[in-house]
Amino acid sequence: SICFIDDKIPVSQYEYFNDTDIINGSVLSFLLKNEETDWSDTVVKEMCRRLLCEPDKWSISAFTSPQFYNNYTKSTVYAPEVIIYDWDYNTGAASDESEQCLLDILKTSYTMIFIFSEQDNIREIEDVVKKNEFVKFKDRLCVIDKSTPGSIDLIFNGIQEKEQNNFTFRYGHKIIYNSNQAI
């Protein structure tokens, strides 16, 4: 399963969707199919489209802020295998806040996180993930410049590499899922 945490998911354009809760694949599919939806981030739109084209392979969901994700996971058993994490938010969240939210997610999950952001943030993000508190999570973090041609393929290739070379990534979520279902 893949989860986007990105404020550019255009769910707030429709009053009948709650942009503070989980946005499931059906809602994302609606947003993609509705011609009136204004996707300000075409890279995120294309990534969602590609994921939704393979429903047997991918389960997709989204949140419009890391705080909404953290709130949701405190009340619900939810652990995506991959998070596509945007660094900047129009809500005015400072880099420090984005950094703390990322650290909270890393500490409370076993999720692989692709920080997928604009070029002007990449150097700052790379400096953040080199900090001592992030070093132990380096195998679960990858920084990708959203504006790089083929950036979506870099994420897909990164996921495929983890599936092939990392036992925990390949089987860990199945074990955790089955354990949670048994409880």
Predicted regions and their residues:
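Extended charged low-complexity segments that act as oligomerization/scaffolding linkers
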Residues: S1-I183
